[in-house]
Amino acid sequence: ITGTDLVAWQIAVAEGRPLPLVQDQIVAQGHAIEARLYAEDPAHDYLPATGVIHRFAVPARPGLRVDSGIVSGSVISPHYDPMLAKVIGTGASRDDAAAILADGLVRMTLHGPVNNRDSLVAILRSDAFLAGDTTTAFLDEQVHVLAPVASAEDGQRHAVAVAYALAASEAPVDAVPLAWSNVPAAPQFVTLQGRGGAGYTTVLVDRHRDGDRIRLASTDDVPYAQVFSIDAAELPGASARVEPAGDGVVVVVEVAGVAARCAVARYGDEVFVDDGLHSSAWTVEPRFADHSLDAAGHGPSTTVPGTITAVSVAPGDAVVAGQTLVMLEAMKMEHRILADVD
């Protein structure tokens, strides 16, 4: 940041006037970094996403600025660029600006389509970025930087928070809570799928007078009928309590000796969790298999509608995993749809 108006200077030069300052007179007064928040999936070749922005809120704090055309309720369509906002962090040093920007992104409430927020935070907090090692090859050379920001314990806390929030929202005793088993002799359970095609997590809660026993089980496939045969692992000393909070609920969850206040918001089958340090999104699986979906078949799909511009295979061709099947044009970009298996 130098306090100079470069646009005004360009106009002055175009009019034949001299520059008002020479290089030695320009003094840096701080640093600013801009991050572009996109509805795109870094884990799937940055494929753009569409959908409803259920909630968008940015915390006010010194040094943070947000330029955005979206509000809560906005729809991200396939007809335009998927950029959601430009977020700028300003500080006395480059490290300060990066820290302010990362903190603002983390504390932002963004309930909607898959986006690149976690990747931006990981980059801003990486040693390579803070050291200034930022060429155009950064993402290719620093692939490890884009590893998940949240830990396994964070994911466990969020899954437990979702389970307790769902139970609280379906409180009537004489009703069957959506996605919950209410058999008195059996533990209550709910199955959740993490965002981005992640595996399934089943949270099982045994209710006791002296406290709940919380267990977790992870699978690659939805464990409908076999849920009780899963070797669910108990979370020793885990506890949770629900507190009302505006439109949603706050669940205070303790796992591995670390407690977190998890704000949980639900929109249909989508559930979002924010704890002030990490965010996650989940899909609530129905209690029983939807056979109409099973009959629909399986195969490669895309999260965004578009126009098929090229077909790379023909009926009867043998394909291998990772092979391009079709090219799809959407949001001013071309996307390859790949085979999932051989």
What are the functions of these language-model segments?
Residues 259-303:
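Catalytic P-loop NTP-binding/switch module of NTPases
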Residues 226-258:
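A conserved acidic, glycine/proline-rich C-terminal tail/linker
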Residues 291-342:
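Structured functional modules or segments
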Residues 213-217, 253, 272-274, 337:
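SH3/SH3-like beta-barrel fold
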Residues 193-199, 217-220, 231, 256-258, ...:
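Short strand-coil-strand connectors
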Residues 2-224, 231-233, 324:
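Catalytic cores of soluble metabolic enzymes centered on carboxylation/carboxyl-transfer
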